């Protein structure tokens, strides 16, 4: 098991209930896409899974360690096994790209090696290899504030590829990329997770990226799970209901103009196709 959430709720300090009664289980090696409108709770859900936030109620378990035992040492050990891709990577602008990538293993290295690597990169070949996978090898020694938003996102992905964690949590990892590059990058992440037997949970705005690349889809709306289904059982009416607050148009990447024609039009079509 990678994680288990049982009736998890999360209320922020301002009183806003971001998550309400979330129950979710992921076995090792699953690839799950979180979809839903802005403000649905996807980022909060990923934050709980990454131990950045502790549930207000309910129970969260990550790698068989439940939140009652999330002390400093336990959290440090868990985070060494978790890789997070942020929508806006928290990378200092003056930091070199090579250092940002190597930071992926700071939690796995002894303290002396982590400190030394911040001064002088200790695994330049490893960082270069990770950057090559996202077509940024030429930026190895560039400063991070010289990069575009899309390039910074790819540096964040290279850091996770270098880290090789057991659980990857990706929060809108390709939001700043053009459609073709977004598709290639999502395929890179899913292929890496599949090859290593790692668990991947990614929140995505574009439903075609989610349905076309992830076997399991979790729809999140107003802090609750609206549905949790194999991708082939998600129907057009389900998607429209999920995104009703954002208008009639579903969020779809431009590289899949005929995407909706491949999605079951209703539940009956889904049952006929899947059962």
Curated annotation (Swiss-Prot):
Q: Which GO terms describe its cellular component?
A: plasma membrane
Q: What is its EC number?
A: 7.3.2.2
- In what way does this protein cross or attach to the membrane? Peripheral membrane protein
| Gene3D superfamilies assigned to the protein according to its UniProt record, in alphabetical order | P-loop containing nucleotide triphosphate hydrolases
Which reactions does this protein catalyse?
phosphonate(out) + ATP + H2O = phosphonate(in) + ADP + phosphate + H(+)
UniProt GO molecular function: ABC-type phosphonate transporter activity; ATP binding; ATP hydrolysis activity
Q: Where in the cell is it found?
A: Cell inner membrane
Q: List S-S links within the chain.
A: none
What the entry lists under InterPro entries is as follows: AAA+_ATPase (IPR003593), ABC_transporter-like_ATP-bd (IPR003439), ABC_transporter-like_CS (IPR017871), ABC_transpr_PhnC (IPR012693), MetN_ABC_transporter-like (IPR050086), P-loop_NTPase (IPR027417)
- The positions annotated for binding ATP are 36-43
Organism superkingdom:
Bacteria
What Pfam families has UniProt attached to this entry?
ABC_tran (PF00005)
Keyword annotations from UniProtKB, A to Z:
ATP-binding, Cell inner membrane, Cell membrane, Membrane, Nucleotide-binding, Phosphonate transport, Translocase, Transport
What region holds the ABC transporter domain? 3-247
According to its UniProt entry, the function of this protein is described as: Part of the ABC transporter complex PhnCDE involved in phosphonates import. Responsible for energy coupling to the transport system.
Tell me which family the UniProt entry assigns to this protein: Belongs to the ABC transporter superfamily. Phosphonates importer (TC 3.A.1.9.1) family.
Alphabetical list of PANTHER family matching this protein: AMINO ACID IMPORT ATP-BINDING PROTEIN, PHOSPHONATES IMPORT ATP-BINDING PROTEIN PHNC
Subunit note:
The complex is composed of two ATP-binding proteins (PhnC), two transmembrane proteins (PhnE) and a solute-binding protein (PhnD).
Q: What is this protein called?
A: Phosphonates import ATP-binding protein PhnC
Q: What is the lineage of its organism?
A: Bacteria, Pseudomonadati, Pseudomonadota, Betaproteobacteria, Rhodocyclales
